[in-house]
Curated annotation (Swiss-Prot):
Zn(2+) binds at C190, C198, C201, C204. It is an enzyme of class 6 (ligase). It comes from Campylobacter jejuni subsp. jejuni serotype O:2 (strain ATCC 700819 / NCTC 11168). Transmembrane segments: none annotated. Catalyzes the ATP-dependent conversion of 7-carboxy-7-deazaguanine (CDG) to 7-cyano-7-deazaguanine (preQ(0)). One of its GO terms (biological process) is queuosine biosynthetic process. This is 7-cyano-7-deazaguanine synthase.
Length: 224
């Protein structure tokens, strides 16, 4: 019986690369996407489906966690809050694009699904560089989440949360993705737009900087 990994895939560059790395390690991939009614959900869902097709994933889940929007308090789900433009977060205070405890919620649900599917690993594309001020993007948080899941699931089930990108910067991620033939043109990073990436939000800036430092051109369309 093949080993199985649950890959949390947002439709973005990091989580997609993680799924490709899982496949390279010989895992049968079960793909998981969360719909929390963020601004670019339809685009992200479309990317998720295309990525699953490219990976030849046979089993995937799209789970409705729209209660995250009801909690609010962030610019990704609340359109009355402006998304910051042309500035990267450099403080230890979470930016307004931080969705409170999002990765904690995602991993709790992923733990349940991983137990049901008997997955030995969960792959999640957290990156500490992206998570300046994001308390749920650190290696320390992930280790505690793994302990929490293993403590709260059946005794004959143990899962390892794998974060192969957590210490990498965006340039290294771009380089690795292209080396592994990851179709980055199928991925989406923009926080605000679904047709053409804005090129100005925190996520777009990190992506563009990564491509520039790696010496490659991003193939997705930008407004600016």
């Amino acid at each position: 019986m093949s080993k199985k990994a649950l890959c949390i895939i947002s439709g973005g560059m990091d989580s997609t690369l993680c799924a490709y790395l899982a496949k390279k390690e010989g895992y049968e991939i079960i793909a998981l996407h969360f719909d929390y009614e963020q601004r670019t959900q339809e685009k992200e869902k479309e990317c998720f489906k295309q990525i699953c097709k490219a990976l030849k994933v046979e089993k995937s889940y799209i789970l409705d966690v729209s209660f995250i929007k009801d909690i609010g308090g962030n610019a990704l789900t609340d359109k009355s809050i402006d998304i910051p433009k042309n500035e990267l977060c450099t403080s230890d205070t979470p930016p307004i694009t931080y969705v409170p405890f999002r990765n904690g919620i995602f991993l709790s649900i992923a733990g349940s699904l991983a137990e049901k599917e008997n997955c030995e690993s969960i792959f999640i594309g957290v990156v500490e560089e992206d998570g300046s001020g994001y308390p749920d993007c650190t290696d320390e948080f992930i280790q505690k989440a793994q302990e929490f899941i293993n403590e709260g699931t059946s005794k004959n089930f143990k899962v390892c949360i794998k974060t192969p990108l957590v210490r990498l910067n965006k340039a290294k991620i771009v380089e690795l993705a292209l080396k592994e033939n990851v179709p980055l043109e199928l991925t989406w990073s923009c926080y605000e737009s679904e047709d053409e990436a804005c090129g100005e939000c925190d996520s777009c800036l990190l992506r563009l900087r990564g491509f520039e430092k790696a010496g490659f051109k991003d193939k997705i369309k930008y407004k600016s």
